[in-house]
Amino acid sequence: GEKAIECFRQMQEGGLSPDPVTFICILKACASVRSLEMGEQICLEINKQGLLEENLMLGNALVDMYIKCGLPGKAQEVFEQLLVKNVVTWNGLITGYVRHGLVNEALECYGRMRSENVAPDVVTYTCILKACGIIGSLEIGEPVAAEVQKQGLFRKDIMLGNTLVDMYAKCGALKKACEVFEQLPVR
């Protein structure tokens, strides 16, 4: 991370203009070393060049950088600026909210994602089930768990399977937790 940031600085000092791929790489480096200051400079440059609206991967990298630097509110701002969002974009925000203990925001974001007809994936389901376990909400978790079970996803992904068992256990549905546990291919 630090080496990439130093290389980027040298590139700028040499008068070379970064392209979107360079920005994505440096944002990942900023996220990995939690360099908010450099990340904010990059964000300003991206906005100055008007690159955010047309590059989804750049938007995803910015959301990720702000989440990893501890600023979910800034990640939300970037998210709202994006004209196009995919499951990775939504997952970045949902994962970040859960990571920072903002469970209600994660669930609200998931609801918006579903209302915009974006299909959840294993990452989405894992985060939402974790959120439901944190707040002990079987009412919200059960329909999500039903989708996961219907698709057989919990048998294909060990993390999702464990999170499903954990959610049921934290919600007090120990019998259901044991049933799911018994169906896991790897224990």
Q: Over which residues does each language-model region extend?
A:
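Long hydrophobic segments that form regular secondary structure
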Residues: 70-85, 165-187
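Pentatricopeptide repeat
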Residues: 4, 19-24, 39, 54-55, ...
